[in-house]
Each structure stands twice: as structure tokens, then as C-alpha cells.
């Protein structure tokens, strides 16, 4: 019986490790697919655990910069710790601000990334988040929305906000809306 339990624990642990490796590859692929490298300005509007944010930061070269929007001071301190640990402080920054009223100038980011938009409640607030993303997106900038649902609604809202070049891609099994301002 102990042997069976031990085998089950090992299999579960290997499954979890495999899942984390696949997620990291997924984010690397998304960054590569968007050609997010070098001296570009990136806004990550939905930093969660910070791993994707750090992966994106590693793709940049100074003076390129990624700014991660965080919702509270605890998350801000955690992200600052990750930035320091990954040695990307020259090109990554955590900012505590409201995603429905960003504290950035118009058209200042080459890339804007939003993940987990379906978690924003109430649903009407998602439209406001997208409106702010479009506002800060530079001319010829790219907006990427990584989400598990509501893609058709997001496309409709982006068209309403004046974004015309919109495609839905599947990158490593993840649906991604890529919208380019032209």
C-alpha cells in the first residue's frame, strides 16, 4: 500500500512540474510570437504570480521597459522582490494603479498585455479595462489578450474602440487575441 501511495505522489509531482514547464514555454512562445524583444515599452495590465512578467522582462534590452500593474501593496512588494531576484530592475517596474484608470500618458506603450480579463468583475468593467488598454497603446502598437473566454465580445469592443487589425490565435493551446493599431 505504501508503495502505491509513493508512486501516486511521484506521478502527481511530475505532472505538476510538467504543467509549470509547459506554462513557461507557453509564455516564451507568446513573447516570441509577438516579437516582444529589444527596446520596446510594454505594459502588463494583469500581473498574477509574476513569472510571465519576468519572462517578458528578460526579452527586453535597456532602455526597453516593462511595467507591471499590481492591485495592492502586497503584490507590489512581491513583484519588486521577483524583479530584484531576476536581476531585471533596469528594465522592469511594478506600479500600483487602477486598471480602469491607468496613470500613464496616451499612446506610450508598444505592447499591452492583459491576462485573465474574465476575472474582472462586474463584466461591464472589462470594457473599461480594454478602453484604457487602447488609450495607452502606441501607434503601430500591439495589444495581446490571453483569456479563456469572451473572445468574441473582446473583439467587438476593440473594433468599437477603433482597433481594426484583430486576430485570434492559438499559441500552445491558449487563445490569444492579437490586436494591432495601424
Placement of each model-derived feature along the sequence:
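Core SAM-dependent methyltransferase catalytic element
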Residues: 162-182
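A short acidic, Gly/Pro-enriched loop at the edge of an enzyme's catalytic core
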Residues: 37-38, 42, 97-112
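Conserved beta-strand signature within the Rossmann-like core of class I S-adenosyl-L-methionine
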Residues: 140-147
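Conserved SAM-binding strand-loop segment of SAM-dependent methyltransferases
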Residues: 87-99
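A short glycine-rich, Lys/Arg-flanked "PGG" loop and its adjoining helix->strand segment in the class I
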Residues: 126-139
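A short SAM/SAH-binding and catalytic strip from SAM-dependent methyltransferases
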Residues: 110-124
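Conserved SAM-binding motif I beta-strand of class I
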Residues: 65-70
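Conserved SAM-binding loop of SAM-dependent methyltransferases across substrates and taxa
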Residues: 49-62
Amino acid at each position: 500500500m505504501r508503495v502505491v501511495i509513493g508512486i501516486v505522489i511521484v506521478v502527481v509531482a511530475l505532472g505538476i512540474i510538467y504543467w509549470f514547464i509547459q506554462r513557461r514555454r507557453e509564455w516564451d512562445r507568446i513573447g516570441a510570437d509577438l516579437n516582444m524583444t529589444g527596446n520596446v515599452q510594454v505594459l502588463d495590465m494583469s500581473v498574477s504570480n509574476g513569472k510571465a512578467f519576468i519572462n517578458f522582462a528578460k526579452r527586453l534590452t535597456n532602455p526597453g521597459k516593462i511595467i507591471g500593474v499590481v492591485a495592492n501593496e502586497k503584490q507590489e512588494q512581491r513583484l519588486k522582490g521577483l524583479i530584484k531576484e531576476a536581476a531585471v530592475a533596469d528594465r522592469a517596474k511594478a506600479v500600483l494603479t487602477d486598471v480602469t484608470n491607468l496613470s500613464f500618458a496616451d499612446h506610450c506603450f508598444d505592447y499591452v498585455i492583459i491576462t485573465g480579463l474574465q476575472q474582472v468583475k462586474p463584466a461591464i468593467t472589462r470594457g473599461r479595462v480594454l478602453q484604457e488598454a487602447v488609450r495607452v497603446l502606441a501607434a503601430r502598437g500591439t495589444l495581446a489578450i490571453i483569456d479563456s473566454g469572451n473572445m468574441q465580445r473582446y473583439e467587438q469592443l476593440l473594433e468599437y474602440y477603433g482597433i481594426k487589425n484583430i486576430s485570434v490565435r492559438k499559441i500552445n493551446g491558449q487563445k490569444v487575441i492579437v490586436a494591432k493599431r495601424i
